[in-house]
Protein backbone atom coordinates (compact mmCIF):
# COMPACT_ATOMS: atom_id res chain seq x y z
CA UNK A 1 0.00 0.00 0.00
CA UNK A 2 0.97 3.63 -0.47
CA UNK A 3 1.51 6.14 2.28
CA UNK A 4 1.94 9.91 2.19
CA UNK A 5 2.23 12.64 4.80
CA UNK A 6 1.85 16.37 4.20
CA UNK A 7 0.45 19.59 5.61
CA UNK A 8 -2.62 20.65 3.58
CA UNK A 9 -3.39 24.20 2.58
CA UNK A 10 -6.15 25.57 4.74
CA UNK A 11 -8.83 27.94 3.48
CA UNK A 12 -11.59 29.45 5.60
CA UNK A 13 -14.81 30.70 4.06
CA UNK A 14 -17.56 32.15 6.23
CA UNK A 15 -21.23 31.78 5.33
CA UNK A 16 -23.71 33.99 7.17
CA UNK A 17 -27.46 33.53 6.71
CA UNK A 18 -29.93 36.27 7.53
CA UNK A 19 -33.02 36.31 9.71
CA UNK A 20 -33.86 35.50 13.29
CA UNK A 21 -32.67 31.91 13.00
CA UNK A 22 -29.37 32.61 11.29
CA UNK A 23 -26.44 30.26 11.61
CA UNK A 24 -22.84 30.69 10.68
CA UNK A 25 -21.03 27.92 8.90
CA UNK A 26 -17.26 27.94 8.69
CA UNK A 27 -15.94 25.66 6.00
CA UNK A 28 -12.32 24.67 5.89
CA UNK A 29 -11.40 23.32 2.47
CA UNK A 30 -8.61 20.82 2.72
CA UNK A 31 -6.63 19.72 -0.28
CA UNK A 32 -6.05 16.03 0.35
CA UNK A 33 -3.93 13.39 -1.29
CA UNK A 34 -4.83 11.51 -4.44
CA UNK A 35 -6.41 8.07 -4.22
CA UNK A 36 -4.40 5.47 -2.31
CA UNK A 37 -5.29 2.08 -0.87
CA UNK A 38 -3.84 3.19 2.46
CA UNK A 39 -3.01 6.74 3.45
CA UNK A 40 -1.53 8.70 6.31
CA UNK A 41 -2.17 12.41 5.99
CA UNK A 42 -2.30 15.38 8.34
CA UNK A 43 -5.22 17.74 8.84
CA UNK A 44 -4.94 21.23 10.32
CA UNK A 45 -8.18 22.49 11.90
CA UNK A 46 -8.62 26.10 10.63
CA UNK A 47 -5.06 27.14 11.30
CA UNK A 48 -4.74 25.60 14.75
CA UNK A 49 -1.20 24.28 15.07
CA UNK A 50 -0.18 22.50 18.24
CA UNK A 51 -3.80 21.62 19.12
CA UNK A 52 -3.52 17.81 19.05
CA UNK A 53 -4.47 17.35 15.40
CA UNK A 54 -4.31 13.60 14.75
CA UNK A 55 -2.62 11.72 11.95
CA UNK A 56 -5.38 10.04 9.91
CA UNK A 57 -4.86 6.92 7.81
CA UNK A 58 -7.19 4.67 5.84
CA UNK A 59 -7.03 1.11 4.58
CA UNK A 60 -9.38 -1.34 2.89
CA UNK A 61 -10.43 -4.20 5.18
CA UNK A 62 -13.00 -5.78 2.82
CA UNK A 63 -13.57 -5.46 -0.92
CA UNK A 64 -15.60 -7.12 -3.66
CA UNK A 65 -18.87 -6.65 -1.78
CA UNK A 66 -22.18 -5.69 -3.40
CA UNK A 67 -23.50 -2.38 -2.07
CA UNK A 68 -22.46 -2.81 1.57
CA UNK A 69 -24.83 -0.60 3.53
CA UNK A 70 -24.30 -0.79 7.29
CA UNK A 71 -22.12 -2.35 9.99
CA UNK A 72 -22.33 -3.30 13.66
CA UNK A 73 -19.47 -4.46 15.92
CA UNK A 74 -19.12 -6.80 18.86
CA UNK A 75 -16.72 -5.92 21.66
CA UNK A 76 -14.07 -8.31 20.28
CA UNK A 77 -14.15 -6.71 16.82
CA UNK A 78 -16.43 -9.10 14.93
CA UNK A 79 -18.23 -7.04 12.28
CA UNK A 80 -21.79 -7.69 11.11
CA UNK A 81 -22.59 -6.04 7.79
CA UNK A 82 -25.42 -5.87 5.28
CA UNK A 83 -25.30 -5.93 1.49
CA UNK A 84 -28.40 -4.26 0.09
CA UNK A 85 -29.43 -6.94 -2.40
CA UNK A 86 -27.81 -9.99 -0.79
CA UNK A 87 -28.19 -10.15 2.98
CA UNK A 88 -26.56 -10.16 6.40
CA UNK A 89 -23.05 -11.49 7.02
CA UNK A 90 -20.41 -11.29 9.73
CA UNK A 91 -16.63 -11.10 9.57
CA UNK A 92 -15.49 -12.65 12.83
CA UNK A 93 -12.60 -11.39 14.91
CA UNK A 94 -10.52 -14.26 13.48
CA UNK A 95 -11.22 -13.05 9.93
CA UNK A 96 -13.70 -15.74 8.90
CA UNK A 97 -16.76 -14.53 6.94
CA UNK A 98 -20.12 -16.20 7.67
CA UNK A 99 -23.12 -15.50 5.41
CA UNK A 100 -25.99 -15.51 7.92
CA UNK A 101 -29.35 -14.46 6.45
CA UNK A 102 -30.04 -13.84 2.79
CA UNK A 103 -32.63 -12.11 0.67
CA UNK A 104 -34.93 -14.06 -1.64
CA UNK A 105 -32.85 -15.97 -4.24
CA UNK A 106 -29.55 -15.14 -2.52
CA UNK A 107 -27.02 -17.97 -2.57
CA UNK A 108 -24.67 -19.28 0.10
CA UNK A 109 -26.46 -18.04 3.23
CA UNK A 110 -27.14 -20.24 6.25
CA UNK A 111 -30.81 -19.22 6.02
CA UNK A 112 -32.93 -16.74 4.08
CA UNK A 113 -36.16 -14.78 4.12
CA UNK A 114 -38.16 -15.40 0.95
CA UNK A 115 -40.18 -12.26 1.63
CA UNK A 116 -37.08 -10.03 1.54
CA UNK A 117 -36.21 -8.28 -1.71
CA UNK A 118 -34.37 -5.26 -3.08
CA UNK A 119 -35.48 -2.64 -5.58
CA UNK A 120 -33.87 0.72 -6.25
CA UNK A 121 -32.79 2.21 -2.93
CA UNK A 122 -34.66 -0.46 -0.96
CA UNK A 123 -33.31 -3.74 0.36
CA UNK A 124 -31.46 -4.95 3.44
CA UNK A 125 -30.22 -1.74 5.04
CA UNK A 126 -29.53 -1.06 8.71
CA UNK A 127 -28.09 -3.46 11.27
CA UNK A 128 -27.51 -2.90 14.98
CA UNK A 129 -26.64 -5.06 17.99
CA UNK A 130 -28.64 -5.11 21.19
CA UNK A 131 -26.84 -3.16 23.96
CA UNK A 132 -26.77 -6.44 25.93
CA UNK A 133 -25.54 -8.49 22.98
CA UNK A 134 -22.86 -10.17 25.08
CA UNK A 135 -25.62 -11.74 27.18
CA UNK A 136 -28.58 -12.09 24.79
CA UNK A 137 -26.93 -12.40 21.33
CA UNK A 138 -29.72 -10.31 19.79
CA UNK A 139 -29.39 -8.39 16.53
CA UNK A 140 -31.79 -6.09 14.65
CA UNK A 141 -32.00 -5.69 10.87
CA UNK A 142 -33.99 -3.26 8.68
CA UNK A 143 -35.15 -4.63 5.33
CA UNK A 144 -37.70 -4.37 2.56
CA UNK A 145 -40.30 -7.14 2.69
CA UNK A 146 -43.41 -8.28 0.80
CA UNK A 147 -44.79 -10.13 3.84
CA UNK A 148 -47.19 -7.42 5.03
CA UNK A 149 -48.39 -5.92 1.73
CA UNK A 150 -51.89 -7.32 2.25
CA UNK A 151 -54.42 -5.56 0.04
CA UNK A 152 -52.23 -2.47 -0.26
CA UNK A 153 -49.31 -1.65 -2.55
CA UNK A 154 -51.41 -1.69 -5.75
CA UNK A 155 -50.57 1.96 -6.51
CA UNK A 156 -48.18 4.62 -5.24
CA UNK A 157 -51.07 6.47 -3.60
CA UNK A 158 -52.09 4.07 -0.85
CA UNK A 159 -50.73 2.47 2.30
CA UNK A 160 -47.95 0.02 1.42
CA UNK A 161 -46.38 -1.77 4.39
CA UNK A 162 -43.11 -2.77 2.76
CA UNK A 163 -40.23 -2.08 5.17
CA UNK A 164 -39.73 -3.94 8.43
CA UNK A 165 -37.42 -4.26 11.43
CA UNK A 166 -36.46 -7.85 12.28
CA UNK A 167 -34.98 -9.24 15.49
CA UNK A 168 -32.79 -12.37 15.51
CA UNK A 169 -30.75 -14.50 17.89
CA UNK A 170 -27.17 -15.17 16.80
CA UNK A 171 -25.58 -18.45 17.86
CA UNK A 172 -22.40 -18.45 19.94
CA UNK A 173 -19.93 -19.04 17.09
CA UNK A 174 -21.66 -16.40 14.90
CA UNK A 175 -22.38 -18.96 12.16
CA UNK A 176 -26.16 -18.55 11.90
CA UNK A 177 -29.18 -16.61 13.12
CA UNK A 178 -32.56 -17.92 14.25
CA UNK A 179 -35.85 -16.93 15.87
CA UNK A 180 -36.74 -14.11 13.51
CA UNK A 181 -39.32 -11.76 15.01
CA UNK A 182 -40.63 -8.77 13.05
CA UNK A 183 -40.99 -5.95 15.60
CA UNK A 184 -41.97 -3.20 13.11
CA UNK A 185 -44.11 -4.27 10.14
CA UNK A 186 -45.62 -1.13 8.65
CA UNK A 187 -42.86 1.21 7.45
CA UNK A 188 -43.98 2.53 4.09
CA UNK A 189 -42.55 1.46 0.72
CA UNK A 190 -42.86 2.87 -2.81
CA UNK A 191 -43.99 -0.02 -5.06
CA UNK A 192 -43.97 1.55 -8.54
CA UNK A 193 -42.00 4.00 -10.67
CA UNK A 194 -43.17 7.61 -10.71
CA UNK A 195 -42.58 10.68 -12.84
CA UNK A 196 -39.74 11.96 -10.67
CA UNK A 197 -35.97 12.14 -10.92
CA UNK A 198 -34.64 9.01 -9.19
CA UNK A 199 -38.29 7.98 -9.43
CA UNK A 200 -38.00 4.21 -9.46
CA UNK A 201 -39.66 1.88 -6.97
CA UNK A 202 -38.06 1.59 -3.57
CA UNK A 203 -37.20 5.28 -3.16
CA UNK A 204 -36.51 7.00 0.18
CA UNK A 205 -36.64 4.23 2.78
CA UNK A 206 -34.40 5.67 5.47
CA UNK A 207 -33.14 2.48 7.10
CA UNK A 208 -30.51 3.60 9.62
CA UNK A 209 -30.89 2.38 13.20
CA UNK A 210 -29.12 3.03 16.50
CA UNK A 211 -29.58 2.28 20.17
CA UNK A 212 -29.69 5.37 22.36
CA UNK A 213 -28.25 5.90 25.84
CA UNK A 214 -31.52 4.80 27.46
CA UNK A 215 -31.44 1.44 25.68
CA UNK A 216 -34.22 2.21 23.19
CA UNK A 217 -33.97 1.53 19.46
CA UNK A 218 -34.12 4.51 17.09
CA UNK A 219 -35.19 3.92 13.49
CA UNK A 220 -34.97 6.46 10.65
CA UNK A 221 -37.44 6.26 7.76
CA UNK A 222 -38.02 8.12 4.48
CA UNK A 223 -40.93 9.80 2.68
CA UNK A 224 -41.05 7.07 -0.06
CA UNK A 225 -41.89 9.78 -2.66
CA UNK A 226 -45.42 10.22 -1.33
CA UNK A 227 -46.41 13.83 -0.80
CA UNK A 228 -48.63 13.29 2.23
CA UNK A 229 -46.14 11.16 4.15
CA UNK A 230 -43.94 13.52 6.18
CA UNK A 231 -46.78 15.56 7.70
CA UNK A 232 -49.33 12.73 8.05
CA UNK A 233 -48.81 10.94 11.35
CA UNK A 234 -51.12 8.08 10.39
CA UNK A 235 -48.36 6.67 8.15
CA UNK A 236 -44.94 5.34 9.15
CA UNK A 237 -42.86 7.33 6.69
CA UNK A 238 -40.76 10.45 7.09
CA UNK A 239 -40.52 9.78 10.84
CA UNK A 240 -37.96 8.71 13.43
CA UNK A 241 -39.10 5.93 15.75
CA UNK A 242 -38.01 5.44 19.37
CA UNK A 243 -39.08 1.95 20.37
CA UNK A 244 -38.24 -0.87 22.76
CA UNK A 245 -36.90 -4.30 21.84
CA UNK A 246 -40.43 -5.50 21.04
CA UNK A 247 -41.34 -2.54 18.82
CA UNK A 248 -43.42 -0.62 21.36
CA UNK A 249 -43.04 3.14 21.70
CA UNK A 250 -41.12 4.84 24.49
CA UNK A 251 -43.68 5.98 27.11
CA UNK A 252 -42.41 9.57 26.90
CA UNK A 253 -42.68 9.93 23.11
CA UNK A 254 -44.88 13.01 22.61
CA UNK A 255 -46.59 12.35 19.26
CA UNK A 256 -50.02 11.02 20.21
CA UNK A 257 -51.05 9.77 16.75
CA UNK A 258 -48.49 6.96 16.98
CA UNK A 259 -46.62 6.46 20.24
CA UNK A 260 -43.65 4.95 18.39
CA UNK A 261 -42.87 8.33 16.78
CA UNK A 262 -40.19 10.58 18.25
CA UNK A 263 -40.13 13.11 15.37
CA UNK A 264 -41.85 13.54 12.01
CA UNK A 265 -41.56 15.72 8.90
CA UNK A 266 -38.41 14.07 7.51
CA UNK A 267 -37.38 13.44 3.91
CA UNK A 268 -34.89 10.56 4.07
CA UNK A 269 -33.01 10.00 7.32
CA UNK A 270 -29.67 8.31 6.61
CA UNK A 271 -27.70 8.85 9.81
CA UNK A 272 -28.53 8.66 13.53
CA UNK A 273 -26.08 9.00 16.39
CA UNK A 274 -25.82 10.34 19.93
CA UNK A 275 -23.31 12.93 21.11
CA UNK A 276 -21.09 11.26 23.71
CA UNK A 277 -20.90 14.34 25.94
CA UNK A 278 -24.64 14.70 26.59
CA UNK A 279 -26.59 11.98 24.71
CA UNK A 280 -28.25 14.47 22.33
CA UNK A 281 -29.47 12.65 19.21
CA UNK A 282 -28.59 14.03 15.78
CA UNK A 283 -29.70 12.93 12.32
CA UNK A 284 -28.10 13.31 8.89
CA UNK A 285 -30.60 13.61 6.09
CA UNK A 286 -30.74 13.80 2.29
CA UNK A 287 -31.99 17.07 0.84
CA UNK A 288 -33.80 17.42 -2.52
CA UNK A 289 -31.99 19.70 -4.99
CA UNK A 290 -30.82 21.71 -1.99
CA UNK A 291 -29.82 21.51 1.65
CA UNK A 292 -28.64 18.21 3.04
CA UNK A 293 -29.08 18.63 6.77
CA UNK A 294 -27.79 17.66 10.20
CA UNK A 295 -30.37 18.24 12.93
CA UNK A 296 -30.58 17.94 16.71
CA UNK A 297 -33.86 16.12 17.30
CA UNK A 298 -36.46 17.31 19.80
CA UNK A 299 -39.17 15.01 21.16
CA UNK A 300 -42.33 15.64 19.11
CA UNK A 301 -40.50 17.94 16.70
CA UNK A 302 -41.11 18.50 13.00
CA UNK A 303 -38.31 18.20 10.44
CA UNK A 304 -40.23 20.66 8.28
CA UNK A 305 -40.31 18.67 5.03
CA UNK A 306 -43.68 18.95 3.27
CA UNK A 307 -43.61 17.90 -0.42
CA UNK A 308 -47.42 17.80 -0.70
CA UNK A 309 -48.83 19.51 -3.78
CA UNK A 310 -51.13 22.54 -3.59
CA UNK A 311 -49.61 23.83 -0.38
CA UNK A 312 -47.50 26.88 0.48
CA UNK A 313 -48.46 28.52 -2.81
CA UNK A 314 -47.55 25.50 -4.96
CA UNK A 315 -49.80 24.02 -7.61
CA UNK A 316 -50.07 20.44 -8.82
CA UNK A 317 -46.89 18.35 -9.05
CA UNK A 318 -46.05 15.06 -10.82
CA UNK A 319 -47.59 12.13 -8.94
CA UNK A 320 -48.73 14.53 -6.21
CA UNK A 321 -45.14 14.93 -4.97
CA UNK A 322 -43.36 18.28 -5.11
CA UNK A 323 -40.07 17.00 -3.71
CA UNK A 324 -38.12 17.74 -6.90
CA UNK A 325 -40.00 20.80 -8.07
CA UNK A 326 -39.58 23.13 -9.80
CA UNK A 327 -37.45 22.52 -12.90
CA UNK A 328 -36.74 18.87 -12.20
CA UNK A 329 -33.43 18.15 -13.92
CA UNK A 330 -32.03 21.52 -14.95
CA UNK A 331 -29.57 23.62 -13.04
CA UNK A 332 -31.11 26.24 -10.78
CA UNK A 333 -29.90 28.36 -7.91
CA UNK A 334 -30.46 26.31 -4.73
CA UNK A 335 -32.03 29.29 -2.97
CA UNK A 336 -34.75 29.50 -5.63
CA UNK A 337 -35.65 25.84 -5.21
CA UNK A 338 -35.45 26.11 -1.43
CA UNK A 339 -38.05 28.86 -1.47
CA UNK A 340 -40.42 26.66 -3.50
CA UNK A 341 -40.19 23.43 -1.47
CA UNK A 342 -38.07 24.12 1.63
CA UNK A 343 -36.25 21.27 3.31
CA UNK A 344 -37.08 22.90 6.67
CA UNK A 345 -40.24 24.95 6.21
CA UNK A 346 -40.41 27.81 8.71
CA UNK A 347 -44.22 27.94 8.52
CA UNK A 348 -44.29 25.05 11.01
CA UNK A 349 -44.30 26.21 14.64
CA UNK A 350 -42.73 22.94 15.81
CA UNK A 351 -39.87 23.07 13.29
CA UNK A 352 -36.50 21.71 14.39
CA UNK A 353 -33.97 24.05 12.78
CA UNK A 354 -30.98 22.26 11.27
CA UNK A 355 -27.51 22.88 12.62
CA UNK A 356 -25.88 22.34 9.21
CA UNK A 357 -27.19 22.69 5.66
CA UNK A 358 -24.26 21.75 3.36
CA UNK A 359 -23.94 25.30 2.03
CA UNK A 360 -27.25 24.92 0.21
CA UNK A 361 -26.23 21.84 -1.78
CA UNK A 362 -27.71 18.36 -1.96
CA UNK A 363 -24.83 15.90 -2.28
CA UNK A 364 -26.25 12.83 -0.56
CA UNK A 365 -25.46 12.72 3.15
CA UNK A 366 -25.05 9.12 4.24
CA UNK A 367 -24.52 7.81 7.72
CA UNK A 368 -23.07 9.76 10.63
CA UNK A 369 -21.01 8.77 13.65
CA UNK A 370 -19.48 10.69 16.53
CA UNK A 371 -15.72 10.18 16.73
CA UNK A 372 -14.83 8.66 20.09
CA UNK A 373 -11.46 8.00 21.70
CA UNK A 374 -8.53 10.18 22.71
CA UNK A 375 -6.69 9.09 19.56
CA UNK A 376 -8.93 11.47 17.59
CA UNK A 377 -7.38 14.44 19.38
CA UNK A 378 -9.10 17.71 18.57
CA UNK A 379 -11.75 15.82 16.56
CA UNK A 380 -12.93 13.72 19.51
CA UNK A 381 -16.72 13.98 19.98
CA UNK A 382 -17.17 15.70 16.62
CA UNK A 383 -19.61 14.23 14.08
CA UNK A 384 -18.26 12.43 11.02
CA UNK A 385 -20.71 12.45 8.11
CA UNK A 386 -20.41 10.51 4.87
CA UNK A 387 -21.18 12.40 1.65
CA UNK A 388 -22.02 10.15 -1.29
CA UNK A 389 -21.76 12.79 -4.00
CA UNK A 390 -24.72 13.70 -6.18
CA UNK A 391 -23.92 16.50 -8.63
CA UNK A 392 -26.11 17.99 -11.37
CA UNK A 393 -26.46 21.30 -13.16
CA UNK A 394 -22.98 22.38 -12.06
CA UNK A 395 -23.44 21.38 -8.39
CA UNK A 396 -20.18 20.04 -6.90
CA UNK A 397 -20.33 16.28 -6.58
CA UNK A 398 -18.89 15.73 -3.12
CA UNK A 399 -17.84 12.13 -2.26
CA UNK A 400 -16.06 12.69 1.05
CA UNK A 401 -16.33 12.44 4.82
CA UNK A 402 -16.91 15.70 6.70
CA UNK A 403 -15.98 16.31 10.34
CA UNK A 404 -18.59 18.61 11.88
CA UNK A 405 -17.91 20.53 15.09
CA UNK A 406 -21.39 21.17 16.50
CA UNK A 407 -22.25 23.92 18.95
CA UNK A 408 -23.11 22.94 22.50
CA UNK A 409 -26.81 23.70 21.96
CA UNK A 410 -26.86 21.74 18.69
CA UNK A 411 -28.32 24.64 16.73
CA UNK A 412 -25.28 25.57 14.65
CA UNK A 413 -21.79 24.42 13.74
CA UNK A 414 -18.43 25.89 14.66
CA UNK A 415 -16.55 24.41 11.72
CA UNK A 416 -16.69 21.75 9.02
CA UNK A 417 -13.61 20.18 7.47
CA UNK A 418 -13.09 17.41 4.95
CA UNK A 419 -11.50 14.40 6.62
CA UNK A 420 -8.29 13.72 4.65
CA UNK A 421 -8.80 9.98 4.09
CA UNK A 422 -7.02 10.03 0.72
CA UNK A 423 -9.86 8.42 -1.25
CA UNK A 424 -12.97 9.78 -2.98
CA UNK A 425 -15.83 7.30 -2.67
CA UNK A 426 -19.59 7.14 -2.13
CA UNK A 427 -19.40 6.74 1.65
CA UNK A 428 -22.68 5.02 2.51
CA UNK A 429 -22.25 3.88 6.12
CA UNK A 430 -20.09 5.04 9.04
CA UNK A 431 -19.64 3.20 12.32
CA UNK A 432 -17.16 3.44 15.16
CA UNK A 433 -15.40 0.17 15.96
CA UNK A 434 -14.32 -1.06 19.40
CA UNK A 435 -10.74 -0.12 18.47
CA UNK A 436 -11.75 3.58 18.21
CA UNK A 437 -11.33 3.47 14.43
CA UNK A 438 -14.03 4.75 12.07
CA UNK A 439 -15.29 2.15 9.60
CA UNK A 440 -16.93 3.19 6.33
CA UNK A 441 -18.87 1.27 3.69
CA UNK A 442 -18.82 2.48 0.09
CA UNK A 443 -21.22 1.89 -2.77
CA UNK A 444 -18.18 0.76 -4.74
CA UNK A 445 -18.13 -2.42 -2.63
CA UNK A 446 -15.50 -1.76 0.03
CA UNK A 447 -15.28 -1.35 3.77
CA UNK A 448 -12.56 1.04 4.97
CA UNK A 449 -10.91 1.33 8.34
CA UNK A 450 -10.02 4.95 9.10
CA UNK A 451 -7.59 5.35 11.99
CA UNK A 452 -6.37 8.34 13.96
CA UNK A 453 -3.22 8.55 16.07
Predicted segment positions?
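Hydrophobic core register within WD40 beta-propeller blades
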Residues: 71, 127, 209, 269-272, ...
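Beta-propeller domain segments
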Residues: 45-51, 108-118, 122-124, 132-134, ...
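Asp-box/WD-like beta-propeller blade repeats and closely related beta-sheet repeat scaffolds
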Residues: 154-210
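Blade-level signature of beta-propeller repeat domains, shared across WD40, Kelch, NHL, RCC1
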Residues: 429-453
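Surface loop/turn motifs at the tips and blade-to-blade linkers of beta-strand repeat domains
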Residues: 60-66, 101-102, 117-119, 184-186, ...
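Conserved beta-propeller blade signature
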Residues: 78-82, 136-142, 216-220, 280-284, ...
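Conserved blade-ending motifs and adjacent loop-strand segments that build the rim/top face
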Residues: 411-434
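Residue-level detector of Asp-centered blade-edge/turn motifs that repeat once per structural unit
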Residues: 74-76, 129-135, 211-214, 276-278, ...
Amino acid sequence: SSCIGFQPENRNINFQSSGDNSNMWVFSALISAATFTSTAVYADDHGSKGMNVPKIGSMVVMSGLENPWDMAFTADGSMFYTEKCKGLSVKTASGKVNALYGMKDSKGYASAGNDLFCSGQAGMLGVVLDPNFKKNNTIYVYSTSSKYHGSGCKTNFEKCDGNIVMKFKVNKDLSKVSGRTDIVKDIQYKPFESNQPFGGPGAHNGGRMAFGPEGYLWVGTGDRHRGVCPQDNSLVCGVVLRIDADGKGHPKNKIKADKRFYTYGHRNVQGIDFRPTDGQVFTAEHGPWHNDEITALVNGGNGGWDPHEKRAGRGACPDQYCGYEPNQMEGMTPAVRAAYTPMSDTRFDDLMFPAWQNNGYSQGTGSAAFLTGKNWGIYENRLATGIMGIGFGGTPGGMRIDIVDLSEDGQSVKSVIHMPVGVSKRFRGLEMGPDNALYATTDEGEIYKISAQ
